[in-house]
């Protein structure tokens, strides 16, 4: 059981036939880190409800979550007085079309749309790189059907 759980989405769209991923940069102590929109679950929310809400809050986008893609990463957080807190992040894969991105100023300093290779280079965490790679493979498989 995780001490802390967040849900979010690996969000993509197409620009001139090229798949682009939404990569966000945080604020404050997270300003140096790029990742995917996500946030803590609120009481009574499902994982998908949390993911949809967090994507909307952080990017202004209304997205559609794709069936069949759910990835979990778990790790321990080293916090003062609580060295073994377990953190769980749940990510879905989501698409948006024809919308303007609007960064939530209080939590997001920048949002960029990057192709797979550019996005991979901008992500710092190995877990995020793995999840992006799995999302790209999933989309490549599903478009070949």
Model-derived segments and their meaning:
Residues 1-36:
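N-terminal strand-loop-strand
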Residues 10, 23, 91-93, 113:
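Conserved hydrophobic/aromatic beta-strand scaffold that supports enzyme active sites
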Residues 16-18, 29-31, 42, 71-75, ...:
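Short, charged/polar surface micro-motifs in flexible loops or helix N-caps
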Residues 29-34, 101-145:
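Nudix hydrolase/Nudix homology domain
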Residues 36-69:
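The catalytic Nudix box helix
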Residues 54-58, 67-72, 134-144:
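A general structural signal for short secondary-structure boundary/capping elements
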Residues 60-100:
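Active-site segment of metal-dependent pyrophosphate-handling enzymes
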């Amino acid at each position: 059981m995780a001490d802390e759980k967040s849900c979010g989405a690996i969000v993509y769209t197409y620009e001139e036939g090229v798949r682009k991923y939404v990569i966000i940069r945080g604020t404050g102590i997270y300003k140096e880190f790029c990742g995917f929109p996500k946030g803590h679950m609120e009481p009574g929310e499902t994982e998908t409800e949390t993911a949809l809400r967090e994507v909307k809050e952080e990017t202004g986008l209304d997205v559609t979550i794709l069936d069949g893609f759910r990835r979990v990463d778990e790790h321990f957080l080293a916090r003062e007085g609580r060295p073994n807190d377990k953190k769980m992040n749940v990510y879905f894969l989501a698409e948006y079309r024809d919308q303007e991105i609007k960064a939530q100023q209080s939590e997001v300093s920048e949002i960029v749309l990057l192709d797979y290779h550019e996005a991979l280079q901008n992500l710092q965490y190995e877990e995020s790189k793995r999840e992006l790679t799995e999302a790209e493979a999933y989309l490549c498989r599903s478009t070949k059907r």
